[in-house]
C-alpha cells in the first residue's frame, strides 16, 4: 500500500520495491525492522538496484527502519537519531523520550550534537508515548517519543505510533537533500 498509494503518486521510483503483495504467510522473511534477515533483504535490494533509500515496516506499520544507498541500516539507535534530527530542525531544544536501552553515544548525539534533551524511560512504546504526553502536560516541550524497535510517535501526529509517518518524513528529507545534490548517506 505505502509504495503504490503514497510514494508513487508523489513521483518516487518504486520499481525496486519488494514484497508489496501481502499474503499473511510472510514467505520471504519476518516483517520486522529488528529481524536480521529482513534488514539484509532491504540492504541487498538497495545495493543491487542502486536505490537511494530503502524503507521497511512491520506488519501493522507502526514500526519502521531505513537503509541508506550504501546498504547501511538506519535502525535501533540510528532510527532514533534520524527521527530526532528531523524533529530538531523544527523544534530546537525539545525533549526526546526513548526507551531505556539507547546508547550513551545516542544521548551525546542528541544533547551535544543536536542540542536536544534526552529522557530515557522504561521500555514499551506505550510507556514512552505516555511519558511524552505527560511531559507536555507539565509544560515540557516534547515532540518525539521513540523506541529503538522503531516505534515512533510525534506530537505533530497526535503521538500515534506510526511507522509510515516517520518513514514519510525520512523520504521527504532524503528527496530534499537529493535535490540539493546530497545523499542521505552524507548526513548520517
Write out the residue ranges for each language-model feature:
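Phosphate-binding and adjacent anionic-ligand microenvironments
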Residues: 53, 91-188
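Short, acidic/turn-prone active-site loops that include or flank metal/cofactor-
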Residues: 19-23, 78-81, 122-127
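Gly/Ser/Thr-rich active-site loops/lids in small-molecule metabolic enzymes
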Residues: 12, 16-19, 72-91, 163-172
